Amino acid sequence: MQLFNAVRNIGKAHLKYNQEARQKVPDGLWVACPKCQQSIYHKDLGYYRTCPVCQYGFRTRAKVRLDWLVDSFEPAGDLAQTPNPLHFPKYPQKLRKAQQITGLEDSILTGVATIKQQKFALGIMDPYFIMGSMGSATGEKITRLFELATEKGLPVILIAASGGARMQEGIFSLMQMAKTSAAVKQHAEQGLLYISLLTDPTTGGVTASFATEADIILAEPKAVIGFAGRRVIEQTMHEQIAPDLQDAETVLKNGFIDQIVARQDQKKVLHQLLKLHERGAHY
């Protein structure tokens, strides 16, 4: 009996030790890559948060990208207010939460930036703001960005990351497709350069409007780029589609983008393109 009690006590002590050790291990040390499914130690993602196995770029906040890409940045005033025209339930609360998470008023950060003294208008979408969806305020900020660039004679660089039009605003969000496209057209008519960089994900109404209307379209490795999502396509076609159909590499092969650029090279490539087209988009 004493031997049994001793063994039981040892077992309890071992269980308690394991529970305490488990509690001391912080969350988030290991992350699963959404593309290759490999488990990665978080420090191995590095400064640019890139999978060391497949080079997939993890979704990143707009203000973090800003540090990667530019030497200076002057933000545009956040004058565009996000409406709730359909009185969608809990939409204001969802907006406030997204604003707290990202530090942005809406899903895009806009302003005027420089890379090695090359000045340009910059917009960076944030996938952590309601999946980077495009609402009325987003469309207004993008439109104002292009109008400013047209007025000042500046090129535009826009980093797209969006699930598409924001469902909480219904037809008002879809109207932003035409609105932003008109602003892009006016900018192009002045012979000014527009570069877009498509990141994961770039889908829906954003893909069908300003994101793919650029003079030069770049993308990140393994980024999902398309209009409808995989599930919608498969339900419509009643068949499975290739796993890589909407990957940037397939989109490049099919001629819809111009180049895939890794995160560590983006600042250099963008500077080279700005320098090359100092006289305008057609030089």
Swiss-Prot record:
UniProt EC number: 2.1.3.15
Zinc as UniProt keyword: yes
Main location: cytoplasm
Location within or outside the cell: Cytoplasm
Reaction equations catalysed: N(6)-carboxybiotinyl-L-lysyl-[protein] + acetyl-CoA = N(6)-biotinyl-L-lysyl-[protein] + malonyl-CoA
Cofactor binding summary note: Binds 1 zinc ion per subunit.
Keyword check for Coiled coil: no
Keywords associated with the record: ATP-binding, Cytoplasm, Fatty acid biosynthesis, Fatty acid metabolism, Lipid biosynthesis, Lipid metabolism, Metal-binding, Nucleotide-binding, Transferase, Zinc, Zinc-finger
Domain of life: Bacteria
GO cellular component, one term: acetyl-CoA carboxylase complex
Coiled-coil residue windows: none
Cofactor(s) this protein requires: Zn(2+)
Residue numbers binding Zn(2+): C33, C36, C51, C54
GO BP field: fatty acid biosynthetic process; malonyl-CoA biosynthetic process
Class of enzymatic activity (EC top level): transferase
Short name of any one Pfam family annotated for the protein: Carboxyl_trans
GO molecular-function terms, A-Z: acetyl-CoA carboxylase activity; ATP binding; carboxyl- or carbamoyltransferase activity; zinc ion binding
InterPro entries, sorted: AcCoA_carboxyl_beta, Acetyl_CoA_COase_Trfase_b_su, ClpP/crotonase-like_dom_sf, COA_CT_N
Zinc finger (C4-type): 33-54
Pathway the protein takes part in: Lipid metabolism; malonyl-CoA biosynthesis; malonyl-CoA from acetyl-CoA: step 1/1
Assembly notes: Acetyl-CoA carboxylase is a heterohexamer composed of biotin carboxyl carrier protein (AccB), biotin carboxylase (AccC) and two subunits each of ACCase subunit alpha (AccA) and ACCase subunit beta (AccD).
Function: Component of the acetyl coenzyme A carboxylase (ACC) complex. Biotin carboxylase (BC) catalyzes the carboxylation of biotin on its carrier protein (BCCP) and then the CO(2) group is transferred by the transcarboxylase to acetyl-CoA to form malonyl-CoA.
Family statement: Belongs to the AccD/PCCB family.
Name of this chain's protein: Acetyl-coenzyme A carboxylase carboxyl transferase subunit beta
Source organism of the structure: Latilactobacillus sakei subsp. sakei (strain 23K) (Lactobacillus sakei subsp. sakei)
